[in-house]
UniProtKB/Swiss-Prot annotation:
Coiled coil: none annotated. Keywords: Cell outer membrane, Membrane, Protein transport, Signal, Translocation, Transport, Virulence. It comes from Salmonella typhimurium (strain 14028s / SGSC 2262). Belongs to the bacterial secretin family. T3SS SctC subfamily. This is SPI-2 type 3 secretion system secretin. Residues 1-20 form the signal peptide. It is found in: Cell outer membrane.
Length: 497
């Protein structure tokens, strides 16, 4: 931000009230005859004669012998300084006298204040009117070099600090508006729906608003202006995918750093799901140990939880060799012992929930005394999974936080109140997978109806009497519903070393 030059002039004007005056030297002519008189005492007599306050360094221990004839006091002081190697400096109210050996150098750096204006101010105050206090600008920097006696260095440092800090305070208290364009993150909230649920993924603006809730004033005060009471303010520009911040200028550097940290490129992760029904009877014939393993195609898969004979509980396990598992599953599918119902896949960002939903909606009539309406019922397979990429000592892993809901409509059991019935199963789990591994979930037994028809060709299609030549059968088989979930990193050029 460009500092308002008028502000510098105002500050210099305020400090001008403390302007240093030159020595007035009001008094009678001074003359002295002395022998072995301490030089400090001579200087005290000179200052008293002209009614001037003086501070003399205790390191001045020389003695004076001789005569000081009447003359201009400035010449008298300069002659003594040259004769005894002294440095003098007058700050407007006090005359300081030091040995030349106490000359010190100091570099003062400014944040905002211009070095040229600072030196101009010092000269206008007569602060640099003697060799005991000099200030030079260091070319190409925002710093000055001060050469002078200790009291000069102290005074110059104080003035530099007051002026520079006043400008910083004025600059920081100014209200500023900045725009930060995002590359990877989203400024606005992202919202999507599935079934009757609404999911909101907060954008950067919502994160900033949530973070600053405790610092936002809730009401106006007598000392605060309406323009600053609601600070900070955050808004999103969807056209540029940018965050607009309105706050004090002093806070903008912090916002810039925070938004940069939030705007990081996220790895893409592909999640694929296979919904599988395995004939329970065939699995038993192949040798199922519900407590430890399922044998598919002649090879066992270990489970970490068991199934009892009632088939009311589920299991989950990690399959290390997914390709071999799929070969055995395909063999069972060819012999009609297993069925892959669907195999959807989706790509999502790291730490962003993905939803896979296959459902059917049917309606039922609800009738009251004077009103009737239709209510919808939705059921089917719903998978919600949030992947998280982990780097464990150089090994890339994917943590899955998932929830599976598996439902289907069942035939009503009541003839007097024929409302639809829905059978639901739900699994919630977490798992960490290495590359090439898959997660197998499920194990719920459910009935599956298989309709078949046997008929005599042509005769079975005759209207009215055709049913005499055909046989319709409905068989109910017990199947086990399995979910095979695989997550893999999509290579988009991001390194995770």
């Amino acid at each position: 931000m460009v500092v308002n030059k008028r502000l510098i002039l105002i500050l210099l004007f305020i400090l001008n009230t403390a302007k240093s005056d030159e020595l007035s030297w009001k008094g009678n002519d001074f003359t002295l005859y002395a022998r072995q008189m301490p030089l400090a005492e001579v200087l005290h007599l000179l200052s008293e004669n002209y009614d001037t306050a003086i501070t003399i360094s205790p390191l001045i221990t020389a003695t004076f012998s001789g005569k000081i004839p009447p003359g201009p006091p400035v010449d008298i002081l300069n002659n003594l300084a040259a004769q005894y190697d002294l440095l003098t400096w007058f700050d407007g109210s006090m005359l300081y006298v030091y040995p030349a050996s106490l000359l010190k150098h100091q570099v003062i750096t400014f944040n905002i204040l211009s070095t040229g204006r600072f030196i101009h101010y010092l000269r206008s105050q007569n602060i640099l009117s003697s060799p005991g206090c000099e200030v030079k600008e260091i070319t190409g920097t925002k710093a000055v070099e001060v050469s002078g006696v200790p009291s000069c260095l102290t005074r110059i440092s104080q003035l530099a600090s007051v002026l520079d800090n006043a400008l910083i305070k004025r600059k920081d208290s100014a209200v500023s508006v900045s725009i930060y364009t995002l590359k990877y993150a989203t400024a606005m909230d992202t919202q999507y729906q599935y079934r009757d649920q609404s999911v909101v993924v907060p954008g950067v603006v919502s994160v900033l608003r949530e973070m600053s809730k405790t610092s936002v004033p809730t009401s106006s005060t007598n000392n605060g202006s309406p323009a600053t009471q609601a600070l900070p303010m955050f808004a999103a520009d969807p056209r540029q995918n940018a965050v607009i911040v309105r706050d004090y200028a002093a806070n903008m550097a912090g916002y810039r750093k925070l938004i940069t940290e939030l705007d990081q490129r996220q790895q893409m992760i592909e999640i694929s799901v296979k919904i599988i029904d395995v004939n329970a009877g065939d699995i038993n014939q192949l040798g199922i140990d519900w407590g430890t393993a399922v044998s598919l195609g002649g090879k066992k898969i270990a489970f970490n939880t068991g199934l009892n004979d009632g088939g009311a509980s589920g299991f989950s396990t990690v399959i290390s060799d997914t390709s071999n598992f799929m070969v055995r599953l395909n063999a069972l599918e060819k012999s009609s012992q297993a069925y892959v119902l669907s195999q959807p896949s989706v790509v999502t960002l790291n730490n962003i929930q993905a939803v896979l939903d296959k459902n059917i909606t049917f309606y039922t009539k609800l009738q009251g005394e004077k009103v009737a309406k239709l209510e919808s019922i939705t059921t089917g397979s719903l998978l919600r999974v949030t992947p998280r990429l982990l780097n464990d000592n150089g090994t890339q892993k994917i943590m899955l936080n998932l929830n599976i809901q598996d439902g289907q409509q069942s035939d009503t059991q009541s003839e007097t109140d024929p409302l639809p019935e829905v059978q639901n199963s739900e699994i919630a789990s977490q798992a960490t997978l290495l590359a090439g591994q898959s997660l197998l979930l499920g194990g719920f037994k459910q009935g599956k109806q298989i309709h078949s028809q046997n008929k005599i060709p042509l005769l079975g299609d005759i209207p009215v009497v055709g049913h005499l030549f055909r046989n319709d059968t409905t068989q109910v088989h017990s199947v086990i519903r399995l979910f095979l979930i695989k997550a893999s990193v999509v290579n988009n050029g991001i390194s995770h070393g």
